[in-house]
Design a protein with these regions (language model features):
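Active-site glycine- and acidic-residue-rich loops that bind
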Residues: 94-96
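Long, low-complexity, Lys/Arg-enriched
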Residues: 1-88, 99-214
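Conformationally flexible catalytic loops at phosphate/diphosphate-handling active centers
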Residues: 91
Length: 214
């Protein structure tokens, strides 16, 4: 079973060339929002899929400008297809907003997928060279535990002492790992707005995707 994925904007032609270039396709998963022109393009893609005998699933993207939301939805579909035994031939990232394309590229890098872009004028497919990296494997088990604790308790700003006490770890151990994570630019030590003498740990929203805590 061979599947292809694609982001879809206002033009069906940004996706259709991949149907022709990929042999043995039996399933297509399309990511698009509810803009009337996007739905028109989706109707055309459905028509072509019907003619070619290809099953098509549409995944709605509520906010086409929310990179993390789109990436999480895309990765969920990738995992589902893999569990079902599909070979994912390629991810066409040509359609939709720039944020949707960026989300698709991010997922391709994290999941080890091939990706293509389709030229706006010639409709020629352009394979995209990507380094495929499992970012979570760059972290030690201890670092993952610390980041998970920080993310789970992110509502309240925490110092390194707070983290050590909350996790029942030695402060020196936590300080060492925090320093390493800050060096990797995974978290940041910033001034506490309520007490400028204190440094609190801040993490970005992308950490949720990196640690697969969705």
């Amino acid at each position: 079973m061979v599947a292809i994925l694609g982001t879809l904007g206002f033009r069906a032609n940004s996706l259709l060339p991949t149907f022709e270039s990929t042999p043995g396709v039996d399933k297509v998963v399309v990511f698009c929002n509810d803009h009337p022109r996007a739905l028109e393009a989706l109707t055309e893609v459905r028509r072509v899929c019907s003619i070619m005998g290809i099953q098509i699933d549409r995944v709605a993207v509520p906010d086409a400008f929310d990179l993390l939301q789109a990436a999480k939805a895309m990765r969920q579909q990738v995992r589902l297809l893999k569990r079902e035994g599909h070979e994912i031939a390629v991810f066409n990232i040509a359609g939709g907003t720039k944020m949707m394309s960026a989300a698709a590229l991010l997922v391709c890098a994290m999941e080890g997928l091939n990706s293509v872009y389709v030229h706006d004028e010639t409709y020629r497919e352009i394979p995209l060279p990507l380094l495929k990296v499992d970012y979570s494997q760059l972290l030690t088990t201890a670092q993952k535990e610390i980041l998970t604790y920080i993310w789970t308790n992110r509502v309240k700003p925490m110092t390194q002492v707070d983290i050590a006490q909350g996790m029942g770890k030695h402060k020196a151990t936590i300080n060492h790992h925090i320093q390493m994570l800050e060096g990797k630019n995974i978290l940041h030590l910033v001034e506490d707005p309520s007490d400028r003498r204190r440094k609190v740990v801040r993490v970005d929203d992308a950490l949720e995707l990196m640690l697969e805590m969705d």
